[in-house]
Every structure is written in C-alpha cells, then in structure tokens.
C-alpha cells in the first residue's frame, strides 16, 4: 500500500472578472517538463501550467496560469457541461523538431462522442511557456477505432520509439476491457500535420487486466513514460458500466509495465483517490524508487482537484 502526500489544491487565479469556478475540479492529464507542470481538465477549454521545482515540491502554491485551447464557453450547469465538454484526457510531450525546438504538447479527447474527437497541439516557448495552439479534427481517426471498440474511451498516451501508445479505459460492462493500443508514431504525426491521404492504422491491441476490487476492474486513467522505456500507469476502479456515467471510486493503484507491456509492479493507493494524471517528479532518477506526481478528479465541481506526491518502488 502506498500513501500519497498532498502537495496542493489546484486553484485558479482570482481576478475581478473571475468565473464562479475558482479551481480545477476534473484534472485529467499531467506533464512535467521545462521546470513546469502542465495540466488539462476534462471539463475545461484551457491548458493550465505552473512553475514547479522538484527539490521543494511541498512549498509551491502559486495559482495556475491558463492558456485557452478551444473556442467558446462551456455551460456552468453540471449536466449541460458534461454533455458539451471536450473531454480532453490525454496530455503528452512531443519531441523537439526544427520548427519546435522546445517540443510541443499534444492534447487528445477521449474519442467516444463527437464533441470528444478533437486534438490540440501547443507550441512551447524557450522558457517552456505555452504558445500558439492548433486544433485538429480527429473524427476520421476515432471513427476507425470506434468500429472495433464500441465504448471508446482514450485516457492516456505516450510516444515510445517509433510507436504511439494510447490507453483504452475499460469499465464493468461485459466486453469493455482496458487495452494498450499502438500506432506508427511518424504516420500519426504526419496525418495530424495535414497529410490526410492515409489514416493511421491500429498496429496492435494488447488487453490489460489489473484485477478488480469489490467486483470493479482496475482500469488505466493515464501513463508516464520512464527513461528505460517502461511506463507507469495510474489505475482506478470506478463503479460504472459505461464511459460517460460517473461512479464511486472503489480503489486506486499504480502499475508499472516493462517495454514489452508486461506487468512488473502493482501497488494500491491508500484512500482510493481518483487519480486521472501521472508524471515523473524529476528526470534524475536515483535508485529504484520513482518519485511520482498525481492529479485527482473527484467528479464534483465543488471539490478542487489536488496534486499528490508518492514514492513508487
């Protein structure tokens, strides 16, 4: 059993024109790079970021800064917002290129509903600050996946060599299994960049089974790639039978997969926090313990999301 440490709540800046929502309540993705934390929330139209020093993780409480990604305003009403939200669930760092020497961030919607089939690329400045963003329509890509995965729900992803790896999150419904999906990374990025001649095709689909708690399967909500090519997955057991309806979080855990996708370690998290994002706290890994950062989604707009820290053996 692992015991996460609370580092901070994810408050937004307060201004004279502040909206009623003063915090993130549905954090869904996390990247740590360029001395910053970058976050997305599944019911927001913005990227959020804040300076972060892994040497003093518990001493930082500056408000999050926002960078708009999608146009328009989402409804304040909880039910209407859930129907309209873009459901941005995957946040990953793309490698540097001559056109983007600091790399780019890529956000992906979960893909189930039409409103959730968009991606946003964000350029990063020399200091890591978010710059211009480009919105991509992923309808064709997700239509192809939906043909073979009925309850499509992409929750995380990463680049591993020449592969793009995406995580399909399962649920309690019969046949709704979690899976690791792989694609040709170069082809996907070319397609994303405008070469729409040929859709990226699914190369492999590996079923993921992490057991269950009280009859509820542990399913992946995010992933962080490690320097050795293995990855850490955040897992929750949410008592629901579809990808849209929320349910009670029965348990939470972290799992480590080797580069071949085989399970190496699985540890439950005390308190069953509904973790939706995971990232390495530092790239300078010493020994066998991984310092990880986690963000939570309480499925309640009145409850702020939190940033947690845990040592993963």
What positions do the PLM features span?
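Sequence/structural signature of beta-propeller domains
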Residues: 1-313
């Amino acid at each position: 059993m692992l015991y996460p440490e609370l580092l901070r709540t994810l408050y937004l800046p307060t201004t004279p024109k502040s909206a009623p929502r003063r915090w993130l309540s549905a954090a869904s993705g996390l990247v740590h790079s360029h001395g910053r934390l970058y976050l997305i929330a599944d019911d927001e139209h913005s990227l959020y970021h804040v300076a972060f020093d892994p040497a003093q993780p518990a001493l930082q409480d500056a408000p999050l800064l926002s960078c708009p990604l999608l146009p328009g305003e989402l409804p304040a009403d909880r039910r209407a917002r859930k129907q309209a939200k873009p459901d941005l669930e995957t946040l990953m760092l793309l490698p540097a290129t001559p056109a983007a020497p600091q790399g780019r961030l890529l956000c992906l919607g979960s893909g189930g509903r039409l409103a959730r089939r968009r991606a946003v690329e964000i350029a990063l400045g020399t200091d890591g600050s978010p710059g211009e963003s480009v919105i991509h329509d992923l309808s064709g890509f997700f239509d192809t996946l939906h043909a073979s995965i009925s309850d499509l729900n992409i929750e995380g992803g990463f680049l591993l060599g020449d592969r793009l790896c995406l995580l399909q999150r399962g649920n309690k419904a019969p046949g709704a299994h979690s899976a690791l999906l792989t694609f040709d990374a170069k082809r996907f990025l070319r397609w994303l960049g405008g070469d729409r001649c040929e859709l990226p095709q699914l190369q492999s689909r590996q079923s993921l089974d992490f057991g269950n708690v009280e009859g509820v399967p542990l399913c992946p909500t995010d992933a962080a790639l490690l320097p050795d090519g293995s990855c850490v997955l955040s897992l929750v057991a949410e008592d629901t039978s579809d990808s849209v309806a929320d349910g009670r979080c029965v348990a939470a855990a972290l799992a480590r997969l080797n580069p071949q996708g085989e399970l190496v370690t699985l540890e439950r998290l005390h308190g069953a926090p509904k973790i939706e994002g995971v990232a390495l706290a530092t790239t300078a890994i010493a020994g066998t313990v991984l310092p990880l950062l986690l963000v939570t989604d309480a499925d309640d707009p009145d409850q702020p999301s939190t940033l947690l820290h845990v040592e993963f053996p």
